[in-house]
């Protein structure tokens, strides 16, 4: 019996260590356990590439806000614009460009051409924008294309 008594404490030591680690890992009742952060394959916590020093790069969102502001300052230098009004103007420009792109795509499809050229854009501007606004847009667009091709 004496040898069995000596084996029991030796066998209990690993058994005692397991519940101790389980107690540490278990969260109190009513709380969810914290999920561990998973690292990408090949990266470790001790590795040279840690996330502590680097900030996550923001996803760039393209807007027309700076251009709207520049035009506003050219037309009315003393007037400002609220963020809500700027957001509305940005949505308006996105909507107009979307309509022009859709109309240009339709025109290219009707004419069985794979490419949208300045001619399709010009025609779509005439179709989408009303009267005087279309005339001004076409003249400004023609001027911009001429400037681009000459440089």
From Swiss-Prot:
Q: What is this protein called?
A: Histone H2B.1
GO MF term list:
DNA binding; protein heterodimerization activity; structural constituent of chromatin
Protein origin, superkingdom: Eukaryota
Q: Which family does it belong to?
A: Belongs to the histone H2B family.
Q: Does the keyword Transferase apply?
A: no
Compartment list: Nucleus; Chromosome
Q: Which residues are modified to N6-acetyllysine?
A: 7, 37
